[in-house]
């Protein structure tokens, strides 16, 4: 799934999500993206951490959309990327970022055999 979101300042950000997204996310940030989004019992402290997760996810999906060499991503590159945005840019657009990711996880195949 590929999409473009518009940040409040009018800046467009391309995002792409695919089967590799959660693995690339874990590779760089050491967190299990599937577990984060599947855990519905979050307390207030965990919800604050989710804001960081959304920004990190936006970085991974933007890197995929831009065709970057995903094996070379680093925390320094993440911080450099962040310097191009305002502190709240991705938090304000959190639902859009999450929707791009989640739309890539939906099953789109249809059953080949009809149930009896």
Model feature map: region roles:
Residues 18:
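Residue-level signal for threonine
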Residues 52-64, 96:
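Short, hydrophobic/amphipathic alpha-helical patches that form generic packing surfaces
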């Amino acid at each position: 799934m590929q999409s473009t979101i518009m940040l409040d300042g009018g800046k467009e950000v391309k995002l792409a999500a695919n089967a590799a997204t959660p693995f690339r996310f874990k590779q760089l940030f050491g967190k299990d993206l599937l577990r984060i989004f599947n855990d519905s019992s979050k307390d207030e402290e965990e919800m604050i951490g989710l804001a960081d997760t959304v920004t990190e996810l936006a970085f991974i999906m933007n890197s995929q959309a831009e065709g970057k060499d995903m094996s070379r991503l680093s925390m320094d590159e993440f911080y450099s990327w962040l310097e191009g945005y305002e502190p709240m840019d991705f938090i304000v657009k959190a639902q859009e970022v999450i929707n791009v990711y989640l739309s890539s996880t939906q099953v789109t195949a249809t059953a080949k055999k009809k149930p009896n």
